[in-house]
Amino acid sequence: RIESLPELVFSSKTIHSFKKHLQTFSPTALVVKDDLIALRLIQWLNNQGIKIPKDYSIISINNSSFAEIMHPFLTTYDINIQELGKESVRKLVAILKNEETEPKKVTIPFHLIERESVTSI
């Protein structure tokens, strides 16, 4: 298990402090919440002379079509978006029909797609 530090969790609102922390903390890997954001991050890092995965490993979530068109190809979690959508619609229909009112835990399987944006350390 890899621990993260709350002060190293960034959003689009805190991107400027991300840039500062990147130089201060020198991480080996970055976890990004979406493939499109990862694409933009990789482009920005490349413009700074930073190479992926040589300098930083990057992993993302979603396994969108962007993951296979960027360079390097993006290592990403496939979160099974179709099944997630189907389950959401089932739940919504059940609520609208008053068939289900109690919260219910639903687990949608996901898996890691290993490509080129991560290296061993």
Region locations from a protein language model:
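Bacterial carbohydrate/catabolite-sensing allosteric modules
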Residues: 1-121
